[in-house]
Regions:
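A contiguous, well-ordered beta/alpha segment that forms the leading edge of an enzyme domain
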Residues: 1-139
């Protein structure tokens, strides 16, 4: 009979857990360790809180009107982000993250309208040019 094994860990400033069914604890632990290692790898590469992440490089390019070449994994993520933007008629937009500067989602309060309006000119995929593997800020 299969048994449920749980492996709690922390990642991306959150409590996480891997839950796996198996009959061999050692085998299940190996799979859980591989999953947790992959989460750590993704966090290292794409965390907005790490100054050494790929995402930090991309955000730096967006702020200084520069350009950067990205690796294949990041290119696939950008391809997907652009596809989601298109399919959602622009509702999904990776450039909207700048709103975190004025929007404290934990407070339950809306930010000042002027604070939002001041950031809106910096939001929109039209501010970027994506020609694989080159991402360029047009601002």
């Amino acid at each position: 009979m299969l048994q449920l094994f749980s492996f709690p860990f922390s990642a991306m400033a959150s409590a996480c857990a891997v839950h796996l069914y198996g009959d061999d604890q050692i085998g299940v632990e190996a799979v859980a360790e591989a999953a947790m290692a992959e989460v750590a790898r993704i966090e290292q590469r794409y965390s907005r809180y790490r100054s050494d992440s790929v995402l930090a490089d991309i955000n730096d390019v967006a702020q200084r009107a520069g350009s950067t070449a990205v690796d294949d994994e990041t290119a696939k993520l950008l391809d997907y982000a652009y596809a989601c933007h298109q399919r959602s008629d622009g509702l999904f937009d990776i450039t909207s993250g700048i709103l975190r500067r004025v929007w404290d989602f934990k407070s339950g309060q809306l930010p000042d309208r002027k604070a939002i309006d001041d950031l809106l000119p910096r939001i929109g995929l039209s501010k970027l040019s994506w020609q694989r593997p080159q991402l360029t800020s047009l601002q």
